[in-house]
């Protein structure tokens, strides 16, 4: 088992001969800042470069210092201040050689908020205003028509020969009392109680059956709200629950949410 690396020997070399090493360590402890973090303190650029390139074989000594906190964040930065890697360690844990190699050489996994809804939107209240469009058809930029899947839960696109299969929509306008530049709406399949709802990036939109057209939409129900924007003859629908995502299509595939290309996000309404 390899021990938690001691980088104090390396930090000593970063101070000039005229500087008091022990007083620097005391100052560091009082402020409870990690000595591992190259972004703290007044270390020279050469020290930062040395820290980034440390190998576990060079840092196998035990530390004789006592820390008030049981956890420390280890991070490495480049010379221009960009964080290259970051780890949170516990001094109560033992580490294998593989653990230390991973900390030294591997970048921390990035958490992708691809499907996380915009949480502050749950505080908004959308009140039903009026029916603005009825029994209209939406075609994408490839002139594909939207139709309902056999399972009735999803929408797909293709070039239809039988236009009786194309889906017609009703659009209801809502008011949130918030940003006047946005136009919140719901999309309902005509002659039904099936409403289009968002599920996340690259996920198909889901058809939710509701007993009636909702008069007030709040909280988790904001997946029913889309912001309608019309530019010339192109129409866009941005999700209120996922503000960076649009209702989108691909060639002969399910209608889904996407940021843009390779998906198509503009529609013709007729």
Curated annotation (Swiss-Prot):
PROSITE patterns: INTERLEUKIN_1. It is found in: Nucleus; Cytoplasm; Secreted. Residues 85-89 are annotated as: Nuclear localization signal (NLS). Residues 1-114 form a propeptide. CDD domains: beta-trefoil_IL1A. Glycans are attached at residues 64, 139, 143. Pfam families: IL1 (PF00340), IL1_propep (PF02394). Gene3D superfamilies: 2.80.10.50. The modification N6-acetyllysine is found at residue 85. This is Interleukin-1 alpha.
């Amino acid at each position: 088992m390899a021990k938690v690396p001691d980088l104090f020997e390396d930090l000593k070399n970063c101070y000039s001969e005229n500087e008091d090493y022990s007083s620097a360590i005391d100052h560091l402890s009082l402020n409870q800042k990690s000595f591992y973090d190259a972004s703290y303190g007044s270390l020279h650029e050469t020290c930062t470069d040395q820290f980034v390139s440390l190998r576990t074989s060079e840092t196998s000594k035990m530390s004789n210092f006592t820390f008030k906190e049981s956890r420390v964040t280890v991070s490495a930065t480049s010379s221009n201040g960009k964080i290259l890697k970051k780890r949170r360690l516990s001094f109560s844990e033992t580490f294998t050689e593989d653990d230390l190699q991973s900390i030294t050489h591997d970048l921390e996994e990035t958490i992708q908020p691809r499907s996380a809804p915009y949480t502050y939107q749950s505080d908004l209240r959308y009140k039903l205003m009026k029916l603005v469009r009825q029994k209209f058809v939406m075609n994408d930029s490839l002139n594909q028509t939207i139709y309902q899947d056999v399972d009735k839960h999803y929408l797909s696109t293709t070039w239809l020969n039988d236009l009786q299969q194309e889906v017609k929509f009703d659009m209801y306008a809502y008011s949130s009392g918030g940003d006047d530049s946005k136009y919140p709406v719901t999309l309902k399949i005509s002659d039904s109680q099936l409403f289009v709802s968002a599920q996340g990036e690259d996920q198909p939109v889901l058809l939710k059956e509701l007993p009636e057209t909702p008069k007030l939409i709040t909280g988790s129900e904001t997946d029913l709200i889309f912001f309608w924007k019309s530019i010339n003859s192109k129409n866009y629908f941005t999700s209120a629950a996922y503000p960076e995502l649009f209702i989108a299509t691909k060639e002969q595939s399910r209608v889904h949410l996407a940021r843009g290309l390779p998906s198509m996000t503009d529609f013709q309404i007729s």
